[in-house]
Amino acid sequence: MDITDFTAELLGLGEPTHFEPACARLRNDLFARLAEHGFRSIALETDRVAALDGGFSHDLGEVDANRQLLKWLREYNETAEEPLAFHGFDAPTETFSAPSPRTYLEHVRDYLGLDVDIAALTGDDERWSRSEAILDPAQTPGASPEARELRVLADDLLVALHARAPRLDADWWRAKTHATAGRGLLRYHAASAVPGDRETRIARLSGVRAVLMAENLLDIRAIEARRGPTLVFSHNVHLQRTGSGAGAIVGALLGDRYAFIAGSLGHSEAIGVREPAPDTYEGRLQRGTKTWRLADVPDGRKRTDTKPERGYFGLDADLLEGATAVWHLA
């Protein structure tokens, strides 16, 4: 099986954990091969607005392979007839914090040349960005009258942007990305204002993030559709076709235009995972694999020596149910 065998316009390559360096290094090699077969863009699990200028969020800029990817893209595009594009598809949020929507909405306002005092509605940025604004419903501005007015304003800005579409230019897409990010932040803060126990509230926020990720992926495909397919690289939990994550949403809407390759890990010194038991999914994949390989979905059982604290959960029947193939790193 070869990575170029997959013909989906959006190809999801899952990683089993963010903390095994080999995953991102191999991703770079695989994308270079896909670029030779018509792929024209790659999307990573990083803030979409930050990615407009080649930046990273969620500490992904500290990953050497990510910096190497941007370097390779710049060098490739210096001589390429058809340049390759880099996208982020995540929202500008962390699990327990989210910034103010002010700068995102002000960017759109300035692009449209409007006279709207957004800062008067948002107030101090810290009242939005502090962790208490997410952790305590009583301390979030997400349900305030100003926040509701900002959500109406964000919709109005998007309407004005689309009215400007006949005069489309490169800055229009940048402005739209800021507008959707600002609106998404307002949704996230509104969700944080809903009372409930901690588990319920985190699940609700995760659901909002999944929707924002999916919307970004669909938007990226709208931009890239005429140029070629897109490789999206992220943790398995975001790309799997089952459950309620971004992959499940996108998969339902795109059908067979989306394919998911599940990431699998045999052992890892980086996160302290030893050789898998022979009858586990990973154990069956480990046989005959020297470094890595693409394989059909195997039979087996879920391994128990996982590292949830390092974001590693292992393969299971639910994850594999919608997977087209498995990408196993020995």
Residue ranges, per PLM feature:
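Redox-cofactor binding/interface segments in oxidoreductases and associated redox assembly factors
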Residues: L44, V232, H328
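Structured, acidic catalytic/metal-binding patches in enzyme active sites
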Residues: T7-S131
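Short, contiguous clusters of charged residues that form electrostatic/catalytic patches at enzyme active sites
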Residues: R67-K71, V211-E215, D219
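Catalytic core of tubulin tyrosine ligase-like
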Residues: H235
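Extended, H/D-rich, highly charged conserved domains that either
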Residues: F96-T200, R204-N216, P229, R241, ...
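Structural beta-sheet core signal
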Residues: G88, V232, F260-A262
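C-terminal regions of proteins
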Residues: M1-E9, F19, H238-A330
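Hydrophobic N-terminal alpha-helices or hydrophobic patches in metabolic proteins across all domains
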Residues: M1-G61, N77, A175, R198, ...
